[in-house]
UniProtKB/Swiss-Prot annotation:
Record keywords: Cytoplasm, DNA damage, DNA repair, DNA-binding, Nucleus, Phosphoprotein
Gene Ontology molecular functions: DNA binding; protein kinase activator activity
Alphabetized SUPFAM superfamilies for the sequence: DNA clamp (SSF55979)
Modifications made to the protein after synthesis: Phosphorylated during cell cycle S-phase and in response to DNA damage. This phosphorylation is MEC14 dependent. Also hosphorylated by CDC28.
Misc. remarks from the entry: Present with 238 molecules/cell in log phase SD medium.
Self-association state and partner proteins as the record states: Component of the checkpoint clamp complex composed of DDC1, MEC3 and RAD17. The interaction with MEC3 is performed in a RAD17-dependent manner. The checkpoint clamp complex loads onto DNA in an ATP-dependent manner through its interaction with the RFC-RAD4 checkpoint clamp loader complex. Interacts with the DNA polymerase zeta subunit REV7 and DPB11.
Species: Saccharomyces cerevisiae (strain ATCC 204508 / S288c)
Name of protein: DNA damage checkpoint protein 1
Phosphoserine sites (modified residues): 436
GO CC terms in record: checkpoint clamp complex; condensed nuclear chromosome; cytoplasm; nucleus
Record GO biological process: cellular response to ionizing radiation; DNA damage checkpoint signaling; DNA repair; DNA replication checkpoint signaling; meiotic cell cycle; meiotic recombination checkpoint signaling; mitotic G1 DNA damage checkpoint signaling; mitotic G2 DNA damage checkpoint signaling
KW Ribosomal protein (keyword) present: no
Compositional bias segments (type: Basic and acidic residues): 585-596
Amino acid sequence: MSFKATITESGKQNIWFRAIYVLSTIQDDIKITVTTNELIAWSMNETDTTLCQVRFQKSFFEEYEFKPHEIVFGENGVQVIEDTYGNSHKLYSFRVNGRHLTTISRKPDGDGIKSFTIAVNNTSTCPESLANRLIVVIEMDSLIVKEYCPQFQPIKYDPIIINLKYKRRFLDVFGTAASDRNPQEPLDPKLLDVFTNTERELTSALFNEEVESDIRKRNQLTAADEINYICCNSTLLKNFLDNCNVNVTDEVKLEINVHRLSITAFTKAVYGKNNDLLRNALSMSNTISTLDLEHYCLFTTIEDEKQDKRSHSKRREHMKSIIFKLKDFKNFITIGPSWKTTQDGNDNISLWFCHPGDPILMQMQKPGVKLELVEVTDSNINDDILEGKFIKTAISGSKEEAGLKDNKESCESPLKSKTALKRENLPHSVAGTRNSPLKVSYLTPDNGSTVAKTYRNNTARKLFVEEQSQSTNYEQDKRFRQASSVHMNMNREQSFDIGTTHEVACPRNESNSLKRSIADICNETEDPTQQSTFAKRADTTVTWGKALPAADDEVSCSNIDRKGMLKKEKLKHMQGLLNSQNDTSNHKKQDNKEMEDGLGLTQVEKPRGIFD
């Protein structure tokens, strides 16, 4: 055999089947390139706007062998290349029908696949019927062996190294920014691992002779060096794309700054010749915080570097935007979840993009598999990269420090009053109540010449108001009337208490069972230091809560109201006892009088008439 590769694990079989299907949706023909270390399956559409490439490492297959020196038939597909170290490598490329290969690779429903093998036998001993044919052998769990031999056409491999160029620029721009970063703001160790793995990949790549390193300092960067990088969990994007119908929405827009990532699926309106609406415009979007992303590196510009340092909060954050097609992107995202059991649990997707109109590179990596998608973007976006004069790079920091900083900022409530925060320093002051954020603020002159911004007082608002309540002095008049009414009530109770003391003096021997006398209770009510606030039924009001006085020597209103009501109930009880005693004494006097008079005639005597 010139080439042979076997897959026995079910998870690897699923990702192989899914990758072949996605490649067939881009182009009917799939190109396969075989090297000593990997198998590359790729396809490009007819308009050259989408390129999908899947690299299967040698370790992905349980059995992998490649003997290019034995190839006799189809020698047009053999190539010899040299790497950066001067070592020669042979590879073999051919093109096969993707529809046929997808149908062959489809997993049956009622039976499992024990092993899946693809092979090429273009040696001198192969029969003519198997020359330039891809041999596909499938062994089922039911001991059934299926063998297919679709024909292929040998081709030359013309590598498209957009991925290597983007990654080299990524290291040149942000690798130097990471080295010049402030030691007090360290980078995420995972991001440093990304830099290391990218450098290792560029070093071991076979087609990197055209990729040149141009490492420069931050102050030497230009607008042409722009490169942006985003890394997040593929589930964040997949959950959104599952709700998008490719027949309704055909484009995707990504917008990102240092605070949030917004992904929008939309379709533009289509009008006919007579300005008739043929298709409505539709869009749906989702916003993700940058704290939920793994890493991000943004390339922006600023107008003034000194002003940026002085007023960081006031400057406008630059938003990076990119637009590309939805269909291929959605199919590409669905390859990752087909492999359910991952060894390292890496479900991240990485994106590199430059200016609008330049291709966008997407990459997902599994153990032994690397999936890449390149799409041409829309150039009809107003990019503000040339507005500024100074280049600025934004790199995501450590997740732990970002989480602590976010927690500190979130602990402080935006509605908390400053007076309440300083209450500990002012023991005898009243804590400031929280003002409603919906109340309209107005300007009132202070004691000095300056004008201070204040809020309206927390006055009670009734559902049913009187005309007098709309006046400005209504609150003061109301407080005066309440104070006068309380004073009158206190005078009435005091006069009542004085009158009752004389009545209680007579039957004092009958009320010995009571613990406290009425006179004592009256004396307590006459004590001005223990005047109580009388509880009354409040009106129906809509108002904000008001804090109680924070002084320690004052008694709470609830305790005062409770004591006052208790004293009132005792007075009522004593008055009831006195009334009942008076009633019983009156009944006894009447009974004694009747006993003294005796019982008389029950009928009044009348003279009898003539007819009686």
